Amino acid sequence: MRRPLSLLRLGAMLMKEFNHMRRDRTTLGMMVGIPLIQLVLFGFAINTDPKALPTVIYSADSSAYTRSFTAALVNTGYFDVVAEARSEDTVDDMLARGQVQFAVTIPQNFSRDLVRGQRPQILVEADATDPVATGSAISALEQIKLRALSRDLLGVALPTPPSQPAFNVVVHRRYNPENITQYNIVPGLMGVVLTMTLVMITGLAVTRERERGTMENLLAMPVRPMEVMLGKILPYVIVGYVQAVIILIAAAVLFGVPVEGSVGLLSASTILFMVANLAVGFTFSTIAQNQLQAVQMTFFFFLPSLLLSGFMFPFRGMPLWAQTIGEALPLTHFLRIARGILLKGNGFTEIFPDLLAILAFVIVASGIAMARYRQTLD
């Protein structure tokens, strides 16, 4: 005979589970923390219409018309003039390094041709490795072409009809002329996949030993903490490298992503990036008490990496505090490296700042991992 539902017994089971949740503070913190992080990031940090994009001006014509055009650019809210270049080489270098999103070239004799009604052309070069970041700003250029300089040209007898703009704006999408989204997504996908898999797999490394009861055997082995750490990490470096090669081949063959730079340089950068993620995973494995906690910590690290690195949303569209957090994440710098090498043909000089940032992260994460492992030994 089946017993009827007892509210007393049900209440006892509920209290038992709540007590278990209260004791497992790590899991409880993840249950509360991850939704809060999602709320904050999606509510405040995500912006698909970035403003104040860094812009460099290269002007061979110093006139009131040039200054008025520059002011019209800034007034749209999409362009922030951060530098004035002295040569075209400087413009190319700033675009390649990712220091600016736009480069505006005003030709010589611009004001003279303007007054003569010859409709001079202004060249606007956009770093189109992230099409979403530049889309709205490029659309704003059409309004500038129609409205800018209209007040300055009042009273000037122009040979061109009033219905036509006094000058043309030629937009050149650098590194991605056809505005293909896959050129932005696929190189970044390599970093996202490596982050997700390597942090999780390594995060389970030590916790698996603890759950199986073989942790004591590992601690009794006559090996140094660094040797244990390398022994746990190096097999996954090989696995991660195979993943990266498969993704790179698929990017070139299936999606037609160009490979403008050195594959060897990208491979070396990928190894450093993998070590950074493996160090994070090893740190989590020394903190987590079980494999569930290790997986939860992985998502706790992966979610900000995915949203704040510039993979899904424009990095420059985020507020300063979100960009600061993003700069501390290795995925942010690897995305710049991968896109820079594949799409821009960047060399070691251009990617060195991002390599340095990843190396600094490796040193800090490895130091924390070794310190935590020594505590485990004690």
Where do the PLM segments sit?
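Transmembrane helix boundary and interhelical loop/hinge segments in multi-pass membrane proteins
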Residues: 21, 98, 199-223, 233, ...
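Short helix-capping/hinge motifs at transmembrane helix termini and TM-loop junctions
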Residues: 45-49, 203, 207-208, 221, ...
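Alpha-helical transmembrane segments and their short interhelical loops
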Residues: 225-299, 303, 348-355, 359, ...
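Membrane-interfacial helix-loop-helix junctions in multi-pass membrane proteins
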Residues: 175-179, 258, 310-365
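Junction motif at the cytosolic side of a transmembrane helix
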Residues: 205, 283, 342, 357-378
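Transmembrane helix segments
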Residues: 33, 41-50, 288-328, 332
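Long, hydrophobic alpha-helical segments
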Residues: 182-202
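Extracytoplasmic/periplasmic domains immediately adjacent to an N-terminal transmembrane anchor
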Residues: 1-183, 350
